[in-house]
Structure formats: C-alpha cells, structure tokens
Amino acid sequence: MNVGDVIRVETDKGIFEGILLPSTNENIITIKMKNGYNVGILKENVKNIEIIAKGEKPKYELPPLNIEKNEKLKTISILSTGGTVASKVDYKTGAVHPSFTADDLIRAVPELLDIANIKGRAVMNILSENMKPEYWRKIAEEIKKEIEEGADGIVIAHGTDTMSYTASALSFMVKADVPIILVGAQRSSDRPSSDAALNLISAVLAAREPIKGVYVVMHGESGDTFCYLHKGVKVRKCHSSRRDAFKSINSIPVAKINPFTKEIIYLQEVEKSDNSKKVEINTNLEEKVALIKVYPGMDGEIIRFYVDKEYKGIVLEGTGLGHAPEYIFEHIKYATDKGVVVVMTTQTINGRVNMNVYSNGRELQKLGVIGCEDMPPEVALVKLMYLLGNYEPEEVKKLINKNLVGEIEYRSRFDAY
C-alpha cells in the first residue's frame, strides 16, 4: 500500500474510501475523501483495509517558467517554513507537492507577477505546532542571508498556530531596514474557501512598502475583501478556524490592505526604511523560560518544578490586573529567592497589568514579581527569553518594561478593543 493508492478502510465507526496521503504520524492513516476533506484514522481502530486501485507515482516535474526580472519592480523573497499558503495536492496521486520555488508560487498565485520579482524557497518543512527556538534562529539567519543578497522585502510563509510566537521572536532577534512579513492560511489552498492566495498577495504588497519591522498579514474579515497588517509583537490568533482569526492586541492594525486594488491605508504611524538594507541578527535566547497559567486551585509546586530544573525565567499568566492566589506566594518567593526572574501578564489578553490597584498585586511585587504592562503572554515569554539570553538578571528586570520593538504601548487606546 503506497501513497496515492485508492483504499477502503473499515472501522467500528464506518467505512471510509479515498486516496492515501502522506501522514505525519506513523500511527495514523490519512486519506483524502471524494468530498475533498482529509480524514485521519488511528491504526488501532482499523478492522480491515482494501486497496481499490493502485495510484500513480507522483510526478512533480513541470517546465520552468523562465520569467525575466522586471527592473521596475522590487524583489521579494518568500521563505516557507511548512505552512499551507502555496501548498498543492495532486488529487490523482494524493501527493503533496514538496517544493517551494518562485515558479511554484507564481503558478499558484499568478497575480504576484504584477507586484514584485519573486524569489522562493523552503527553509524548513514543519507543522507550526512543532516550532521551537532553534527554528526561530534558523529563520533569522535565512532572513539575513536573503537581505544581504539584495531582497527588498521578506515574506515568511508560516503555519498559523504559533505564528504570533515566531513574529515576536523575529521582532526581537532581527534588526533590518526592510519589511519582514509573516503570512499564513486558515484554510489550505486545495479548498474552495482558502484564504491563502489573498493573504499571500497582501503580504507581498506589504513587503514592497518603504517600511521596516516585523509584521503579520492575515484576513481582516471573514469574506474576501481586505487583509490587515499587524505589528509582530501586538498580534494573536484569536479563533481556531475563522479566516479573520488574527487580531491586534491592545493596539489597532497597522494598515488595511486591498489585494484587488493594491491600495494600502495606514491606520497608525510606522517606522520608515532608509533604503540602506542594513541587517543585524542576535539569536541569543535563553530557552529555560516557562509560561504558567494561574487558575483556581493550582498547585504552586509547578513553580518549584521549573526552579529546580534551573529555569531562569517564569512568565505568570495571572488573573485580572495581574493577580495570583495567595496560596502559591511561598512558591513564587522560592523562585525569586533563587534568582529566577518572575514576570506577570494577564490572561484577559486585552488590557494591561496594574499590580498597584489591589493588595494582591502589591504583595506580589514585594515578592519580586514584575508586571508586564500590556504585553500578551506569548510576547512576554519571547521577550524574557531574549533578554535573559543577552543580559544579567538585574538588567533584565529593568528592561522587561522598556519598549524595545513596539511591544509596549504606555497609553491604552480606547479603540483597541
């Protein structure tokens, strides 16, 4: 039984027929059914498998497009990390096209030809839930390489689950005079409702703008009318499946992008490029930093667990204005006494931490806990990793609330919620 075979799988829950697809888990059989949906079946639940028809060997070779460079257009490098923005499924064989070249991108989204000269390659091929700091370092290094080779802008195709973490990491690690745009798709490009093409077009439009910094581009509403440009340290995935899942947190989107008219309307000021194409990276990250959610009845021993594992930093995702139950105070003190930097965010996501309002917050401050202003928890996590990777703990405590790359807005916007 090979990828591309048409199979019939019998389980206690019914019979499933379709094309056998590559699976990322050896314990799961994945098939594409006639209705276009993929189904994963645990092997332990399979009663019988029958091969209905043998599939064809996947054929990936296509003639080159031989596109000439347009000197009037900017050059944008699109780097894939394994997202689905330009992925294609061969329905005859069930195979997923593994390459990610400029030709592949233009075949998938020919509108790109009128926007920029496109370079494209895959730097890794992972599901975004498997992202980790060593991959952030790899992406940063590849961005530097592309800019040094002349790219006017960078687009990172990324899975949506952890895109905000990667956007935060790149915001701190990469200092570049070109725009770096992360883009993803909530619906894969083999589905009629896919948002991949419009998101990618909008991302390339943003990447050719005379701005610098790290941003995320995704659908602005559930239809197909516009996309938003979000600051990389002020964005979060707020819905598991909607196409407009990404929202700016404690801020408003940077810009509204119309992929049809190519119009970009800026909603707030951004840092302009000076056309120098300078790029520097600092990939020093302290990976022993934990993010712990506070909840009623929690066992404070989890804090001691990380301390005893020699973790250097802990981000608490507290309640309300930045609170935690008094019965874990002794464990927090254990951490700070050991020199662990402990900071506080809020699980409300929107709003800011203010530990001076109630006695609980004031007591936490006496224990050495530092409030993180209006940073989302994942941004605070990545920032603490970056700071601990580059500074001594006492300096980290001073810098955690210093705005480094736009992660903090000291004045709360009424229109940001």
Swiss-Prot record:
Q: Which reaction does it catalyse?
A: L-glutamyl-tRNA(Gln) + L-glutamine + ATP + H2O = L-glutaminyl-tRNA(Gln) + L-glutamate + ADP + phosphate + H(+)
CDD domains noted in UniProt: GatD
Give the UniProt record's GO annotations in the biological process aspect. Answer: amino acid metabolic process; regulation of translational fidelity; translation
Q: What class of enzyme is it?
A: ligase
Q: Does the keyword Metal-binding apply?
A: no
The EC number of this protein is 6.3.5.-
Stretches assigned to the Asparaginase/glutaminase domain: 74-403
Keywords recorded for this protein, A-Z: ATP-binding, Ligase, Nucleotide-binding, Protein biosynthesis
InterPro entries, alphabetized: AsnA_fam, Asp/glu_Ase-like_sf, Asparaginase/glutaminase-like, Asparaginase/glutaminase_AS1, Asparaginase/glutaminase_AS2, Asparaginase_C, GatD, GatD_N
Name the active site residues.
84, 160, 161, 237
The record's section on NCBIfam families has:
asnASE_I, gatD_arch, PRK04183.1
Q: Which family does it belong to?
A: Belongs to the asparaginase 1 family. GatD subfamily.
Name-wise, this protein is: Glutamyl-tRNA(Gln) amidotransferase subunit D
Q: Which organism is it from?
A: Methanocaldococcus jannaschii (strain ATCC 43067 / DSM 2661 / JAL-1 / JCM 10045 / NBRC 100440) (Methanococcus jannaschii)
What lineage does UniProt assign to this protein's organism? Archaea, Methanobacteriati, Methanobacteriota, Methanomada group, Methanococci
Gene name of the encoded protein: gatD
